[in-house]
Amino acid sequence: MFLKAVVLTLSLVAVTGAQAEVSANQVATVVWDYFSQLSNNAKEAVEHLQKSELTQQLNALFQDKIGQVNTYTDNLQKKLVPFATELHERLRKDSEKLKEEIRKELEELRARLLPHADEVSRKIGDNMHELQQRLGPYAEELRTQVNTHAERLRNQLTAHAQSLETTLRQNVDNLQASLTPYADELKAKIDQNVEELKGHLTPYADELKVKIDQNVEDLRRSLAPYAQDVQEKLNHQLEGLAFQMKKNAEELKAKISANADELRQKLVPVAEVVRGKLRDNTEELQKSLAELSSHLDRQVEEFRRNVGPYGETFNKALLQQVEELRQKLGPYAGDVEDHLSFLEKDLRDKVNSFFSTLEEKENQDMLVAVPELQLTPVPLES
């Protein structure tokens, strides 16, 4: 049942709090996914939307999954579960209201922009062209970096596998002692190289967010002369556009990271298999090492093929979102189901605010809890 998956995710988020900062984005995603799932499943919504029942199940699962982990986790549970439950209730109640507000906002915007419809459409088209020019080099650079670092990863791991084969031929009489360090080092190299791969590729998403902000600001300035009486409404629509575009950037980052982690998960077991066969005869071990090299090639090549096109796909998605804005502001838009992105943006803003307040309070409490240093006077010798 989806509800149990949501509760489990919230529990895991809280458990990791002792080792790392709890992510507001994680909690917002859990609540939003839960809301979206229930919105698409009327029967489950009827069964599980009551606040009291949701709170009860969340608290019960916290107790079942984490028990007495530490004071921080216990405190987080007490604050997070009621907050998440209340936020979900507000989402449900605000959805239709916000939908109507966005409909009226777009109607007023269209009416004000109608006398300048052709100019507005041209300005947005120019902005799309500028966006394409800005993002094009990033897509090409991402593909180049994927190819470069994937090839580097392949070369380093293949070289280590070849060292294993060489050592095998030179130390037939003492395989386990000679090869064990190499097998252990191979696993460490896989972890290290995959982390370096992620480190080189994931920053692209943050750079793209800067370009998105620049492009949306350019669009706002170009449309401002046509929306003098409704500038606030135009700004609101552009905020929604920027949110959607940045969400795509976050998804790009997550997809790159997930593919790198998947690559690691496929490579590490093979290294462990080789280590496990050190007690086997030489022929079996040679066969395993030969399979290791080909397996490394296949998995790295698969990663390269999967991740390489992500930049172009990302660019197309952003251009489509700007085109959708042009259609929404045009005279023939009709009804547009646009409120959900604004609802999600509002949700994430509230979660970020909640976590900022919680973090500030935790820091203040820690300062208060630190006892003052007291010096015990030492009697002077007479």
Swiss-Prot record:
Modification after translation: Phosphorylation sites are present in the extracellular medium.
Domain of life, per lineage: Eukaryota
GO CC term, one of those recorded: extracellular vesicle
InterPro entries membership: ApoA_E, Apolipoprotein_A1/A4/E
Pfam families recorded: Apolipoprotein
Signal peptide range in chain numbering: 1-20
Keywords: Chylomicron, HDL, Lipid transport, Phosphoprotein, Repeat, Secreted, Signal, Transport
One GO molecular-function entry: cholesterol transfer activity
Segments for region (13 X 22 AA approximate tandem repeats): 33-330
Any GO BP annotation: acylglycerol homeostasis
Sequence repeats, residue ranges: 33-54, 60-81, 82-103, 115-136, 137-158, 159-180, 181-202, 203-224, 225-246, 247-268, 269-286, 287-308, 309-330
Compartments, record wording: Secreted
Domains as described in the record: Nine of the thirteen 22-amino acid tandem repeats (each 22-mer is actually a tandem array of two, A and B, related 11-mers) occurring in this sequence are predicted to be highly alpha-helical, and many of these helices are amphipathic. They may therefore serve as lipid-binding domains with lecithin:cholesterol acyltransferase (LCAT) activating abilities.
Oligomer and partners: Homodimer.
Protein family per UniProt: Belongs to the apolipoprotein A1/A4/E family.
Function: May have a role in chylomicrons and VLDL secretion and catabolism. Required for efficient activation of lipoprotein lipase by ApoC-II; potent activator of LCAT. Apoa-IV is a major component of HDL and chylomicrons.
Protein's name according to its UniProt entry: Apolipoprotein A-IV
Gene: APOA4
